[in-house]
Amino acid sequence: REKIGVMFGCFSYGTRVQLADGSTEKIGKIVNQKMDVEVMSYDPVTDQIVPRKVVNWFNNGPAEQFLQFTVEKSGGNGRSQFAATPNHLIRTPAGWTEAGDLIAGDRVLAAERHLLSDQQFQVILGSLMGGGNLSPNLHDRNGVRFRMGHGARQADYLEWKTALLGNIGHSVRENDQGARFVDFTPLPELGELRRAVYLGDGKKFLSEDYLKALTPLALAVWYMDDGSFTVRSKGVQQRTQGGSGRIEICVEAMAEGTRERLRDYLRDTHGLDVRLRSAGSGKSMLTFSTEATAKFQELVAPHMAPSMEHKLLPRFRGLGTVEPRFVEPAQRLVPARVLDVQVKPRTRSMNRFDIEVEGNHNYFVDGVMVHNSPETTTGGKALKFYASVRMDVRRIETLKDGSDAVGNRTRVKVVKNKVSPP
């Protein structure tokens, strides 16, 4: 068996490869003309998508069939399309997977433009804890739409937040009561965040990792969105010098377990004396002691909007230093849903093509990350056989602790079981 190689997959002539100059070219043309080009390739060491040279070209003769894939994307017509042999390796969030093992609904990794700076991501994290929300893109496109809205009296605050996200396309509308809403263009980089926060029960779920990621800017946005401040003393007497008061922040939109996690996070991470209580309206509130109020306001004061300084003690006002920070757009990997897999109708030429890419051994076809490999490896690396089992995992219900989602009940079915020679 030493002379038998392992077969790898290929693509049909018309599958478009992403070149380093931003254009695309048919893989068949690249191979037939042995084009000296650079393609975009993912570097796992730097976690960046970078240009790499094509160092080999393969026309591996006729294929029995090609699978035609349609994958969601944010731009253009909202679709990525390519045709591969069933044994070609496609990158998924779980690793490399043969094309023939993918079905509609599975997710693959695709290159999408990222626009958000770290500062902007914190604004969104804080807004989600408050009045902001994420909604899915329509028409099966990749991307998530961030939206925020405020009443007429908070118009200046809404403008301040919108300016921090000023490089993201958006539209503004106003309702009959004067409230304004800002809808941002869908961003693929927020897809995983939406999946983590919205579990289907109508309440926001914030994990330990979400809370650990929060900076004082995110906490400030949360406080400005949903917090209220009541002055207890104006600081005339020496023991209350500088004034004192109490913060309350509404947490009704959060799941019950999330409220407790948030309370514990504020206690353990920031040393704040906070407790949960139910207000007269039945809404859940997070209440700060006078000492915790001063400590929290000192933490968030440099990140407060000028129009929200009435939520600060006098000694913490005028300290805001937040300026918009934008970054250059960059291509990054995001999960993208497979919308459809079909056997491609036979064409006059059924030849299969592949390229070899310097260093990283991967490239992108219409935005989707795929493995590069020659049709065969050296025979010494051949395996005796492959065992491939595909299990279909379906969520059938959400497990809850009170009203907090803590897990899922799933049903698993073996849908493909094959043992075959290479």
Curated annotation (Swiss-Prot):
Compartments reported by the entry: Cytoplasm
The UniProt record lists the keyword Phosphoprotein: no
Listed GO CC annotations: cytosol
Gene3D superfamilies in UniProt: Hedgehog/Intein (Hint) domain, Homing endonucleases, P-loop containing nucleotide triphosphate hydrolases
Listed Pfam families: LAGLIDADG_2, RecA
PTM comment, free text: This protein undergoes a protein self splicing that involves a post-translational excision of the intervening region (intein) followed by peptide ligation.
Major localization listed first in the record, in broad terms: cytoplasm
Coiled-coil annotated residue ranges, if any: none
Gene Ontology molecular function: any one: ATP binding
Keywords (A to Z) from UniProt: ATP-binding, Autocatalytic cleavage, Cytoplasm, DNA damage, DNA recombination, DNA repair, DNA-binding, Nucleotide-binding, Protein splicing, SOS response
Example GO BP: SOS response
InterPro entries named among the record's database cross-references: DNA_recomb/repair_RecA, DNA_recomb/repair_RecA_CS, Hint_dom_C, Hint_dom_N, Hint_dom_sf, Homing_endonucl, Intein_C, Intein_N
Record-linked SUPFAM superfamilies: Hedgehog/intein (Hint) domain, Homing endonucleases, P-loop containing nucleoside triphosphate hydrolases
Protein's UniProt keywords contain Lipid metabolism: no
Free-text function comment from the UniProt entry: Can catalyze the hydrolysis of ATP in the presence of single-stranded DNA, the ATP-dependent uptake of single-stranded DNA by duplex DNA, and the ATP-dependent hybridization of homologous single-stranded DNAs. It interacts with LexA causing its activation and leading to its autocatalytic cleavage.
Family stated for the protein in its record: Belongs to the RecA family.
Protein name (record): Protein RecA
Organism: Mycolicibacterium fallax
